[in-house]
Amino acid sequence: MQFDYIIIGAGSAGNVLATRLTEDPNTSVLLLEAGGPDYRFDFRTQMPAALAFPLQGKRYNWAYETEPEPFMNNRRMECGRGKGLGGSSLINGMCYIRGNAMDLDNWAKEPGLENWSYLDCLPYYRKAETRDVGENDYHGGDGPVSVTTSKPGVNPLFEAMIEAGVQAGYPRTDDLNGYQQEGFGPMDRTVTPQGRRASTARGYLDQAKSRPNLTIRTHAMTDHIIFDCKRAVGVEWLEGDSTIPTRATANKEVLLCAGAIASPQILQRSGVGNAELLAEFDIPLVHDLPGVGENLQDHLEMYLQYECKEPVSLYPALQWWNQPKIGAEWLFGGTGVGASNHFEAGGFIRSREEFAWPNIQYHFLPVAINYNGSNAVKEHGFQCHVGSMRSPSRGHVRIKSRDPHQHPAILFNYMSHEQDWQEFRDAIRITREIMHQPALDQYRGREISPGTECQTDEQLDEFVRNHAETAFHPCGTCKMGYDEMSVVDGEGRVHGLEGLRVVDASIMPQIITGNLNATTIMIGEKMADMIRGKEALPRSTAGYFVANGMPVRAKKMSRDLN
């Protein structure tokens, strides 16, 4: 089999490339996906409110696990990644957050990455998006990804939580993806007008899969990339339960879009990576590239949970006897509790003035439950998901064998810097201040977690060690740049090789301030133009907020806990 391009991974970026490259009818593309189809009849992936279900099994989730994390009481921690058409956009929380403009401007400070500034990237965010309330300088109106904005009146807890943030002295913003990210406001979500998950399989592949120049293979586990000297010329994969590899050749390029965990694994199995690591497994060295699998980053978060005195939380929706009605409303009308992910309000703040842009993120949820659906509190409650955004901690992904089915060694080194501990202590204390503002007085009951007895630095630190969890945002393991630990250049081309690019969240040099899916899609759109040799979209002239040393709180708190 011969194709112009072979794309490995039908995830948030791979589906973008498959769709954009096959817009040219003379370009042939093979799209390989280790998982299965995105079954539209499966409520677990299609109903926004069911977002916890895919993380509880292995049909749609690689269900990776870390090595014992040395600064987290040696816990082995979850590292869920999407498996199936749509990749992690098939199982994520559907929060559409692009990050802060200064994240991208920071990338663009690196020599060779100048065209990755916010104003260079904003046109590609807009190209990907159709926002339900209409387009403007920051949002698109004709893109493949449906973005829904929270509407007033959905749940009184959302507006109360936003108002509490304002009463605590922080700004209010009407658009976390617009002019000003800093502050509290409604959260955009990748949900269709019909109340369905807007994965990249739905948004992109639905328009491309019938094209004769696109071939899609599911249940295709990539074994390795084939090289002729220093040029990538094809891919070998295993289909289903077969142990006999299937092979295809690429006339132009192999495009690796398997994500921050799988992309470095595939490179390492293919002979690209740290020479000493590859020698351990007798893998013939194609190119010594020590940065492959290094620079692993993530967002860590905690839940601060409170009893809700008014019966307005989602607790009744967790009771089995209410779920048939919820399911029917969603299935036949695309409405009701099932049609939202319920992350409809959130915010970004600076915990200290030393940070030039927000370093703490909030997701508000009108129920007290773990992200993966476990440990639901058996009463009306609500919670804040809160965590730091740009931890200096770095980890790695390294293969354990040549077997493509064996999970790699994953170590994030969570909380390995003093900055991490200071940020999380600040986050807990600031959150308590926010939760005790007048806007929440009629709803807020007792603090369920951590509990009011948890006060000292030592007690807060122990709570973090035992209870902080991943936000499922790994990135950085094939970082873009030109230093000795970089893996790809500013166009995603792997250093020292030909015919091979990496296009996914693994190329982010530094993690962004927010959820990763929107920016991963943007990377796919921007790289698609580079691969096709098209001129970049015109640079945006939209303005954006920069704090420039402004106080972190715009005004004095309505109520001071001290």
UniProtKB/Swiss-Prot annotation:
GO terms for biological process: glycine betaine biosynthetic process from choline. InterPro entries: BetA, FAD/NAD-bd_sf, GMC_OxRdtase, GMC_OxRdtase_N, GMC_OxRtase_C. Pfam families: GMC_oxred_C (PF05199), GMC_oxred_N (PF00732). Pathway: Amine and polyamine biosynthesis; betaine biosynthesis via choline pathway; betaine aldehyde from choline (cytochrome c reductase route): step 1/1. It comes from the Bacteria. It is found in: Cell membrane. GO terms for molecular function: betaine-aldehyde dehydrogenase (NAD+) activity; choline dehydrogenase activity; flavin adenine dinucleotide binding. FAD binds at residues 4-33. Keywords: Cell membrane, FAD, Flavoprotein, Membrane, NAD, Oxidoreductase. It catalyses: choline + A = betaine aldehyde + AH2; betaine aldehyde + NAD(+) + H2O = glycine betaine + NADH + 2 H(+). GO terms for cellular component: plasma membrane. The keyword Flavoprotein applies. It is a peripheral membrane protein. Its cofactor is FAD. It is an enzyme of class 1 (oxidoreductase). Gene3D superfamilies: FAD/NAD(P)-binding domain, Glucose Oxidase, domain 3. Its EC number is 1.1.99.1, 1.2.1.8. The active site is at residue 473. Involved in the biosynthesis of the osmoprotectant glycine betaine. Catalyzes the oxidation of choline to betaine aldehyde and betaine aldehyde to glycine betaine at the same rate. PANTHER family: CHOLINE DEHYDROGENASE, MITOCHONDRIAL, GLUCOSE-METHANOL-CHOLINE GMC OXIDOREDUCTASE. Belongs to the GMC oxidoreductase family. This is Oxygen-dependent choline dehydrogenase. It comes from Escherichia coli O157:H7. The gene is betA.
